[in-house]
Design a protein with these regions (language model features):
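Sequence/structural signature of beta-propeller modules
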Residues: 134-155
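Surface-exposed loop and turn segments in beta-propeller and other repeat-based domains
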Residues: 12-23, 70-93, 148-155
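Short loop/turn segments immediately following beta-strands, especially the blade-tip
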Residues: 64-70, 137-141
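Beta-strand C-termini and the immediately following turn/loop, strongest in propeller blades
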Residues: 42-48, 112-117
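Blade-terminus and WD-like Trp-Asp/Gly-His loop motifs, strongest in beta-propeller folds
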Residues: 25, 29-39, 96, 100-111
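Structural motif
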Residues: 1-2, 48-62, 118-133
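Beta-propeller domains
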Residues: 1-14
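Extracellular glycoprotein-like low-complexity segments
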Residues: 88-102, 117, 137
Length: 155
């Protein structure tokens, strides 16, 4: 997965390498551009072959005048606290989760969604929480605002 300059065909940045394709699901990739097109958030999904567990991740790229620089998000991002019916917790089977970029705010902050999906007694519980990342002048990322977890249940 590459960002390519339209006029020249020059590769501006490689987001995923060919060696990553065994785990990488290109159909689930998302690019979220800032209004000035000087920053882009890249969301991706991968899962090991033959395994239903899905992992989502994101990275951010900033324009430096001649290309894009990758900026990785903080390691300990907020994780949703999935809610289970009273007395029904335990014996959960994880199905994955991770973060997905949603939108750039006018302030230059990035809004993301964090998901955690588990199976419990024949039902799928998905905890979702939104949070905001801010960037300093050197593009160091930090968590700024964390919302509340919403739990969805499906069969």
């Amino acid at each position: 997965m590459e960002l390519i300059e339209k006029d020249s065909g020059k590769v501006m940045i490689t987001l995923h390498r060919a060696s990553d394709t065994e785990l990488f699901d290109a159909s689930e990739s998302i690019l979220v551009w800032s209004a000035d097109s000087k920053s882009v958030a890249y969301g991706f999904q991968d899962s090991p072959p033959g395994v239903r567990v899905v992992e989502r991740g994101a990275l951010v790229c900033f324009w430096n005048g001649s290309g894009f620089d990758k900026v990785f998000l903080p390691e300990n991002l907020p994780v949703p606290e999935t809610k289970f019916p009273k007395g029904k917790g335990g014996y959960e089977k994880p199905y994955g989760g991770g973060v997905k970029p949603l939108r750039w705010l006018k302030s230059g902050e990035l809004e993301l969604s964090s998901e955690d999906e588990v199976m419990l007694r024949g039902k799928t519980y998905t905890g979702v929480l939104q949070f905001t990342i801010s960037f300093d002048a050197q593009h160091h990322a930090s968590v700024k605002k964390v919302g509340k977890t919403k739990t969805e249940v499906s069969k």
